[in-house]
């Protein structure tokens, strides 16, 4: 869990993923020689902070987005949401501009957002929720479990993966944008026909804590049922706890796979959280274990 704590302390509001990308690259460099297969690494300016790891001869790709929701400063103490953060008066926000570190409170006035910092903040500065990590015997609670748990899962998968792509993407929380060029690169270098999305969903009346990872049959978008049935069959065979999710809203990097010109099947597989997009996101540790285990199993057997 130590690496997860480090991941949770990195800032990466959508569009500003350079810090978390460098942290991941450093972590990969430190660990890759201890993995079962040492991957080829694709990163840098040609990939806009995204990272692609190629293990062996891939059949399947696992995607995990690096960015988070947050805020950006405008003028006269105004804030604009990045993605869809929860907004409650008094939330503690942090960031940094050219004049130094920032710690302030969110102010909600007539559906408009402001900060209370004692000086003007440079327009275009990113602010994120102050981090407060809490772990007990059953849950982890913190800001940005979405999608730090996906990144953590992907790194765990890397340890024993023999064949597959593992991709760390950007922009997901604010409409996407990196997936088209990532898919093009994959399909031009070592094409695949199937993909898994390691991301976080929400607790509902049908997906509850401690009952296993959620396998999404649909959200706003509907993946091909033939592939979903294959994933469910393998999950059943694995005996790893899982739940089936059916929703009419929400989305992920899977949307951009479905809208791409490539015939790639996809499935969202992730733990469910309470207090979505808030400083107090809460996920069952048992469900996180299931998320890691099932991604490892699926990447081996698909």
Model-derived segments and their meaning:
Residues 1-302:
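N-terminal hydrophobic/helix-forming segments and targeting peptides
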């Amino acid at each position: 869990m130590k690496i997860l704590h480090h991941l949770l302390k990195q800032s990466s509001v959508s569009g500003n993923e350079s810090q978390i990308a460098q942290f991941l690259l450093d972590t990969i460099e430190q660990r890759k020689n201890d993995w079962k297969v040492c991957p080829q690494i694709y990163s840098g300016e040609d990939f806009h902070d995204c990272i692609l790891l190629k293990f062996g001869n891939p059949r399947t790709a696992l995607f995990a987005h690096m960015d988070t929701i947050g805020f950006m400063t405008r003028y006269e103490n105004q804030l604009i949401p990045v993605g869809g953060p929860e907004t409650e008066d008094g939330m503690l926000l942090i960031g940094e501009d050219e004049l130094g570190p920032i710690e302030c409170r969110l102010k909600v006035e007539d559906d408009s957002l402001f900060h209370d910092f004692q000086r003007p903040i440079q327009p275009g500065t990113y602010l994120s929720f102050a981090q407060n990590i809490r772990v007990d015997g059953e849950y982890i609670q913190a800001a940005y479990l979405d999608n730090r748990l996906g990144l953590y899962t992907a790194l765990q998968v890397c340890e024993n993966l023999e064949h597959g792509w593992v991709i760390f993407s950007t922009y997901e929380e604010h409409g996407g944008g990196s997936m088209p060029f990532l898919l093009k690169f994959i399909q031009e270098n070592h094409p695949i026909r199937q993909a898994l999305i390691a991301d976080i969903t929400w607790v509902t009346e049908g997906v509850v804590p401690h009952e296993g990872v959620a396998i999404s049959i649909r959200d706003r978008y509907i993946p091909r049922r033939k592939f979903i049935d294959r994933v469910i069959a393998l999950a059943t065979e694995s005996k790893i706890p899982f739940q089936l999710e059916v929703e009419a809203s929400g989305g992920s990097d899977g949307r951009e796979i479905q809208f791409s010109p490539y015939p790639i099947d996809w499935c969202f597989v992730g733990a469910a959280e309470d207090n979505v997009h808030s400083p107090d996101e809460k996920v069952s540790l048992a469900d996180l274990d299931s998320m890691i285990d099932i991604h490892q199993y699926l990447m081996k057997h698909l």
